[in-house]
A protein has these predicted regions:
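Transmembrane and membrane-interface helices of multi-pass
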Residues: 2-231
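Soluble catalytic regions of membrane-associated enzymes that act on cell-envelope
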Residues: 194-537
């Protein structure tokens, strides 16, 4: 027994396992250093306990990600002795995989206030080129990873004592070793012998839920969310007394010609009433925190004035559906909450027919505008299958203005793009049909680029979202100044909100509720909305 413990202590396998745990602990330290500002204050005892529990939560990662290393070390035999570089290469590949994912999330968690899971892969897709600004902004981290990789390659122990498995000379011993290895890996994958495999959500049973992201790791979150289980099928049918048949609610709304004031967009009301244009303006990363009516530092003087206008309804308690732009479209236009571990737009259910605003807008021209690549986040394909008639992306932007108005990263700056949106509204408003259109801005997104004439002149830290929110507010002011001169303006209802929130320097806006608070304004320049409210709405 003593010789066994001595072998384990000196074994290269043991040294490599300990090195793997050390790397994950190092990643956790870096992640905490960068994200401590949004985590609740914790004592030194809680901090140490979180790291100790974190080692336990690293077991599935070490077992799964480093599996090729352990197979090679134990069963490599003579090839292992002849080609020690393979051991180094396998270990380095596994180590850099964990470090890279943890490194990416070290910065991204500052925006989402949580660990990212398998949705990271969905976010890449055809938008992988958009990672360039993140990489450039974190070039020091990239160089640090490269230096660490070289250091690891130099110190990874590959010579010395290894488990000797001889299937030819000692087949029974080899079989027992293989079974023991498989059993150990299985227990490692599950994180123990408990009834259910260890998942990131289990961290809340060891520490306070608010600091659970410190205990877990991004590789574990990816492992926990990679399996995409199907959802149960439901058929919600309604027995309508007027015809005595079972019809889907949406079918009834669209086919029945009886006037229904609660759904003014669904059909003509008669009596000479003119259906208004409906315009949704979704501002990237617009949180209530950045507005004057959010009791924060006001970066939105125009929106603040608009919220106080008698023709505006301001809703003080509204919440974004998630923390990523890709979650906005199905939520805002289809009423689809983010209850899956993946994005609805990229899920197997994206092609399902769902009730949506464009479908209910009977008799309306429908259009969606976004100044980025046409395929970004799958918006174009998803919206077109909902029944949207027109999608306007960067491909539809005037070629002669592209070079002047491109921000160098995501797409067209907000100010010129909103002016372009007005020109398109002029075309859409031909007097034959009302228009239901939405425009999604993009300037208030990392890397927070604004046009040169505004640089150094706006409030807020240029390295954060704040000064780009101030720019977006200016773009909105100029949008309404121009739009107010158009013949379609008075007969248009504008809905202004944010797709999600972003950074904050206030503790409340990193709470479970505050982190999702976005402003919602409904502005109708031609109608005093407060006099036409339906009770209870």
């Amino acid at each position: 027994m003593k010789s066994l413990f001595k072998f384990i202590a000196k074994s290269n396998l043991t040294q490599q396992i300990l090195l793997a745990f050390a790397l994950l602990t190092f990643s956790r330290l870096i992640w905490f250093t960068a994200n401590a500002f949004w985590l609740p204050p914790i004592g030194i005892d809680e901090y140490i306990w979180a790291h100790l529990v974190g080692i336990y939560f690293d077991v599935p990662v070490v077992a799964a990600v480093f599996l090729p290393v352990w197979i090679w070390v134990i069963f490599g035999g003579q090839l292992r002795e002849k080609h020690p570089w393979i051991n180094k290469a396998l270990f380095l590949l596994a180590a850099l995989t964990t470090l890279i994912f943890n490194g990416i999330d070290t910065g991204y968690s500052q925006v989402t206030a949580k660990r990212s899971g398998f949705e990271l892969f969905d976010m890449l897709g055809d938008d992988a080129n958009k990672l360039t600004p993140y990489i450039l902004d974190n070039l020091g981290i990239i160089l640090g990873l490269a230096a660490l990789g070289y250091f690891l390659f130099r110190i990874i122990p590959v010579r010395g004592q290894y488990p000797q498995v001889d299937f030819k000379g000692r087949p029974l011993r080899g079989l027992i070793t293989a079974i023991a290895f498989a059993a150990t890996c299985l227990v490692g994958f599950r994180g123990g012998l408990q009834l259910r495999p260890l998942r990131s959500i289990d961290a809340s049973t060891f520490v306070a839920p608010e600091i659970a992201p410190l205990v877990t790791s991004t590789p574990l979150q990816i492992i926990s969310t990679w399996q995409r289980n199907g959802l149960p099928n439901f058929d919600f049918a309604v027995q309508w007394p007027n015809n005595g048949t079972n019809n889907n609610t949406t079918d009834w709304l669209l086919k029945n010609t009886q006037p229904l004031p609660e759904f003014p967009m669904s059909r003509s009301q008669g009596g000479g009433w003119v259906q208004p244009n409906i315009v949704f303006i979704v501002v990237e990363s617009l949180a209530r925190d950045y507005t004057g009516f959010g009791n924060g530092t006001p970066f939105t003087p125009f929106l603040d004035r608009l919220a106080a206008d008698p023709n505006t309804l301001y809703f003080p308690y509204c919440y974004a559906n998630g923390t990523k732009s890709i979650e906005m479209v199905p939520s805002l236009f289809c009423g689809m909450p983010s209850l899956m571990s993946e994005f609805y737009v990229t899920s197997a259910y994206a092609n399902n027919k769902v009730n949506n605003a464009f479908q209910l807008a009977k008799g309306y021209k429908t259009a969606f505008f976004h100044g980025s690549n046409n395929g970004t986040m799958g918006f174009q394909s998803f919206l077109k299958q909902t029944g949207l008639q027109q999608y306007h992306g960067i491909d539809q932007y005037p070629a002669n203005l592209y070079k002047r108005d491109f921000d160098g990263n995501w797409g067209i700056f907000d100010e010129p793009y909103l002016q372009h949106f007005i020109r398109c509204m002029d075309t859409l408003n031909d007097g034959k049909q009302p228009v239901f259109a939405s425009v999604f801005t993009l300037s208030s997104h990392h890397p927070y680029t604004i046009p040169k004439p505004y640089q150094g002149k706006l409030p807020g830290d240029p390295s954060t979202v704040q000064h780009t929110i101030a720019y977006a507010d200016i773009a909105l002011r100029k949008f309404f100044e121009t739009a107010s001169k158009k013949p379609w303006f008075e007969n248009t209802v504008f809905v202004i909100t944010g797709d999600h929130t972003s950074h904050s320097d206030k503790e409340y806006f990193y709470s479970q509720s505050g982190h999702y608070e976005v402003p919602v304004l409904v502005y109708s320049p031609g109608v005093n909305i407060s006099e036409n409210l339906i009770p209870g709405q």
